[in-house]
Regions:
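Beta-strand elements within well-structured catalytic alpha/beta cores of enzymes
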Residues: 3-15, 19-20, 34, 58, ...
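Short acidic, low-complexity intrinsically disordered linear motifs used
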Residues: 548-569
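Secreted, luminal/periplasmic, and some membrane-associated catalytic domains
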Residues: 72-102, 109, 117-122, 129, ...
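Short conserved micro-motifs at the rims of enzyme active sites and ligand-binding pockets
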Residues: 136-137, 374-379, 442-447, 480-485, ...
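A long, amphipathic alpha-helix that forms part
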Residues: 175-197, 201, 211, 217-264, ...
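Polar, surface-exposed loop/tail segments
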Residues: 277, 401-428, 483-485, 491, ...
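Low-complexity, glycine/alanine/valine/leucine- and proline-rich hydrophobic stretches
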Residues: 436-493, 498-501
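Active-site-proximal alpha/beta segments of enzymes that process anionic O-linked groups
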Residues: 3, 16-198, 206-213, 308, ...
Length: 569
């Protein structure tokens, strides 16, 4: 019987293009030693590389078309209102539940998209997308529930989210808070690993992602937000945060039995700079795909919108006349609830005359189809024609580069069937856009934030890329080997099950990567694919009988998504 263990460390948002030089210089010695002693490669995320879809694909072993989670939010059934996604919406069993059923002891700490905490054969502390209600003690973020008291004693005051977001002059405060959060997660994980039995243990650190979103402009002289004096003063904060994580990993490795533990380090995606926004709903409005209600107030707001009365322009005025020139990244989101009635917004849309709209974080487009959307107008028989018309028009969008040369803004538009497969693929948006240059970010969910089609970005200074990292090390793993073909994020679950001697469900999209394993391990451990019929997870079925989140939790989750820059009104 296979008695080995698996430790998975998730480093949110990390890519090799960020950390390679630091590892070469031995500034991240723990990560470097894991690479030297094992296998590594880039890890291909889902597309779009959105956190909820990526982590869920990791822990289900399936593409989003088989688990049903595509974005930070989904449309509430029977309306155009968006609600945050959460784990009770996942329609496939997780790696954690599969291992639990097989009798393996499971530990899960701070993994995104695990709230509400699920019952496992072990313990779970939920992570990113847990509603920030202001008091974790009133939130169902642990299993078993009494684990809350235990981790509060270990950590002092356990938190999931940072207290601060970047403004001019607060970097030291921001980074200090990151240190606190990193240390808390490491200490809680170590406590659980020492005090509780586990065969599979997983910890995710999110600060590796947060610092990139907030402070990428410190690294990039070409970034529109680059400030040479600020960059020089804080040139080393990125490395210091990553070194704090690296030191924490070293602590974790000191308390495991390395002879019987396989270690996996992975990220859900990478990040890179964002210089410009493409305001997709503004384009859809200009081209007549979105219609505005013919009531006086909506028509007036539309006229004001065309003349530049928009949240984006008001924000720029605030910056221009700010005495202290404080760049508060989330100020607009905070104020928007107060002033939204003065700006053109989704309440002004005439859905009965709208053919297409964008609600996704990276510019996904839905056709307003009759019989599917509440006020759909496009006949199902005409859907393909409308999509093809949109594809042609979208790929014709132009911009000018820094030299004034005209360039394409959109490289490719894909239909959902080109990205997803499975019983829930039909629930995805209809069209997905890919930009021609990585520095562009497509805004879909921000309804009418600007009357400009393409403009300089503000807020988060980096956004997601598809290139994550994968490192594996341990008794079952080949040494000093680079995998020539980067695995996809949904392939990892199958390989983790194989490390633990568990048959792999046949409905997984991932297969065992034989190049990862030693010949001895392969010869002694048969690869077994179990013929199973995909079924909705028990958690999802139970969630249909009751609300997955309360109204207060939905509001809290949505507010946190805004603060993190993942959702805009």
């Amino acid at each position: 019987m296979n008695k080995s263990k698996v430790l998975v460390i998730g480093l949110d948002g990390v890519s090799f293009r960020l950390i390679n030089e630091w590892m070469r210089n031995n500034q991240l010695p723990t990560l470097r030693s894991l690479m030297e002693d094992g296998c590594w490669s880039e890890l291909e995320s889902v597309y779009p590389p959105l956190t909820p879809a990526a982590w869920t694909s990791f822990y289900t072993g399936k593409n989003p078309g088989k688990h049903g989670l595509f974005d930070y939010q989904l449309r509430r059934q029977g309306s155009y209102q968006m609600i945050p996604t959460h784990s009770a919406m996942v329609k496939s069993d997780s790696l954690f539940k599969i291992l639990s059923r097989k009798g393996k002891k499971v530990g899960v700490v701070n993994v995104p998209m695990t709230y509400p905490a699920d019952s496992v054969n072990g313990f779970m502390i939920t992570g990113l997308f847990t509603p920030d209600t202001g008091d974790l003690n009133k939130t169902n973020f642990t299993y078993p529930q009494q684990l809350k008291e235990e981790i509060m004693k270990v950590s002092g005051q356990y938190r999931i989210y940072p207290r601060f977001f970047y403004t001019k002059g607060n970097i030291e405060e921001l980074v200090s808070d990151y240190y606190t959060l990193i240390d808390q997660k490491i200490n809680v994980a170590m406590h659980c690993m020492r005090s509780k039995p586990w065969d599979f243990m997983m910890l995710v650190i999110n600060e590796t992602d947060h610092i990139q979103h907030q402070l990428w402009h410190l690294l990039d002289k070409n970034h529109p937000d680059y400030d040479a004096r600020e960059a020089q003063r804080y040139a080393d904060v990125f490395l210091k945060v990553y070194q704090r994580v690296d030191a924490g990993l070293s602590q974790l490795l000191e308390i495991i039995d390395k002879k019987n533990t396989n270690i996996v380090v992975m990220s859900d995606h990478g990040l890179g700079p964002v210089y410009k926004w493409i305001n997709l709903n503004t384009w859809l409005l200009r081209k007549g795909y979105i219609a505005i209600k013919q009531r006086p107030l909506s028509l007036l707001k539309h006229i004001m919108f065309r003349f530049g009365f928009t949240p984006a322009n008001i924000y720029r005025l605030m910056l221009r006349f700010s005495r202290n020139k404080v760049v508060e990244k989330n100020k607009l989101s905070e104020k928007r609830g107060f002033v939204s009635r003065f700006f053109l917004n989704e309440n002004d849309i005439d859905w009965s005359a709208t053919k297409a709209y964008s609600i996704g974080h990276m510019g996904q487009i839905n056709i307003n189809m009759k019989g599917r959307e509440p006020q759909g107008v496009v006949e199902p028989s005409a859907q393909d024609a409308v999509m093809n018309e949109l594809i042609t028009a979208l790929t014709g969008i132009k911009d000018r580069d820094s030299s004034g040369r005209q360039v394409d803004a959109i490289k490719q538009v894909l239909k959902k069937g080109e990205l997803f497969w499975g019983p829930y693929a039909k629930e995805a948006a209809d069209l997905y856009l890919k930009v021609s240059r990585e520095e562009y970010h497509i805004l879909g969910g921000a309804t009418f934030i600007s009357n400009r089609l393409i403009e300089r970005s503000y807020g988060n200074t980096a956004t997601h890329r598809t290139d994550g990292i994968f490192i594996a090390c341990g008794p079952a793993i080949n040494k000093s080997q680079h995998l020539s073909k980067p695995p996809k994020i949904y392939e990892l679950a199958a390989n983790i099950l194989y490390m633990l001697g568990i048959p792999i469900p046949g409905d997984f999209d991932g297969k065992v990567i034989e190049a990862l394993f030693t010949p001895e391990f392969l010869s002694q451990n048969e690869i077994i694919y179990q013929d199973v019929r995909q079924e909705q997870s028990a958690t999802y079925k139970a969630a249909q009988a009751k609300a997955g989140l309360t109204d207060d939790e939905i509001r809290a989750a949505k507010e946190m998504l805004k603060k993190l820059g993942y959702v805009r009104d």
